[in-house]
UniProtKB/Swiss-Prot annotation:
One of its GO terms (cellular component) is plasma membrane. Its main location: membrane. This is Fluoride-specific ion channel FluC 1. InterPro entries: FluC (IPR003691). It is a multi-pass membrane protein. HAMAP family: FluC. The keyword Cell membrane applies.
Length: 120
């Protein structure tokens, strides 16, 4: 049952990622992969918040590795960074690495802290 719940969550996460990437692409291109940055940051925020909640195992599987795992994308982040390097867009590539790392860790900490504050 846990595997099925994780798969359902992942399907919703992937659909949400697709919609957010389409919305970012519709706003125009700047050379920086904003869609991927947005989904990764949002996924880290949600994962941090979920980690701080006392959730039943089934809900944790659905929302954590399911929804957040389907929403975030390390492979696309890596591919886009390599593509930027191949195009000799060094500043964009290094900015992509730094922005994803800083925003992801910061968002996870913020999610955990916010839930912790509300639960006190």
């Amino acid at each position: 049952m846990t595997a099925l719940l994780t798969a359902v969550g992942a399907a919703f996460g992937a659909l949400l990622r697709y919609c957010l990437n389409c919305a970012a692409a519709a706003r125009g291109t700047t050379g920086f992969p904003w869609g991927t940055w947005c989904v990764n940051t949002l996924g880290c925020l949600l994962a941090g918040a979920l980690a701080a909640l006392p959730l039943p195992a089934a809900v944790a599987a659905l929302a954590g590795p399911g929804l957040c795992g389907g929403l975030t994308t390390y492979s696309t982040f890596s591919y886009e960074t390599v593509r930027l390097l191949a195009e000799r867009k060094w500043t964009h590539a290094l900015g992509n690495i730094g922005a994803n790392l800083a925003a992801g860790v910061g968002a996870a900490v913020l999610g955990m802290a916010a839930v912790g504050w509300f639960l006190r």
